[in-house]
Amino acid sequence: MSVIFTFGLDQLRRQSPSKTRTYDNGFSLDGANGSTVILIHGLTGTPNEMRFLANYLNKKGYTVVCPRLANHGESLSVLKHTKWQELYRSVRDHADVKKALAGEGPVFVAGLSMGALLALVLADELKERITGVTCLAPTLFYDGWNTPGAKYFMPLACTPIKYFCYFKEEPPYGIRNEAIQSRVHKYYSNASFEHMENVAQYGYPFYPVTQLYQLKLLVRYLSKRLTRMKTPIQLIQAKDDDMTSIKNSKYIYDRVRSDIKEMIFLYNSYHVISVDQERDIVAEKMEGFFSRVKNGGKS
């Protein structure tokens, strides 16, 4: 990741709404087996990155709800002021999520990257209602092989300078599949603060450093609660994750007190495992986990 500073430019406030507001409003798919899966996309990502998993699970009979996180699709000048609590509430208070929670059937929650942490917060707050949780490439720390500079900018994230700093996404963009990576690169390499028309499909090409600070606050909040969590949990991550090392999954696995817990590693993917080369395996492992949990942990 490279870093961009915008001191004195205030470029983001001059963006045209027609070029910066491009929404993927999320989606809901009705199923027939009485169970619901809530999918949470990653920070600066889009519900589109969860669509393959959603379609797979829906074909297995699950109702699937995938909200758009708060302020995703807005300009970076809006997104950079978003608190992690707003992101969380945009999931918890989503109409279809509330409908599922008010029902009687099993409710599972799965999240990608920072979305995995929001899934854990939901499982902790609604422990009596959440049947199981899946964490896909959970991101507590940016310590992957393609994010060597992230730790050096954490001190910046704790100062007002954070409002003027952005990480620029760089290859491989969390994706090992060359065809998908090429499509993302075509968009990201030509994107600027003024032109982000494909945010709804590919997510933001820039990552506000303010959100690095929000991640720190979220991790601080969640770390105090992991040791009391007993909800069945599944963690899936690529061994070669370019954004976050497998230490992230191990950190969670070692602290939760769930009787049913499993950690699965992939060997031909990078960070965004919901769309990468082993997405079929991810979908199968998720559905198998949900089925076992509904069956009392038995295969």
Residue ranges of each PLM-predicted region?
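Catalytic nucleophile-loop/oxyanion-hole region of alpha/beta-hydrolase
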Residues: 74-108
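Short alpha-helix in the alpha/beta-hydrolase fold that links the catalytic acid
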Residues: 53, 231, 245-254
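Conserved alpha/beta-hydrolase
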Residues: 54-76
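Short beta-strand/loop motif that positions the catalytic acidic residue
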Residues: 229, 235-237, 241
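Alpha/beta-hydrolase-fold enzymes
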Residues: 114, 121, 125-205
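Catalytic active-site module of serine/aspartate enzymes centered on a nucleophile-bearing elbow/loop
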Residues: 262-299
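Active-site nucleophile elbow and catalytic-triad environment of alpha/beta-hydrolase enzymes
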Residues: 22-24, 207-225
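Acidic catalytic loop of the alpha/beta-hydrolase fold
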Residues: 240-244, 272
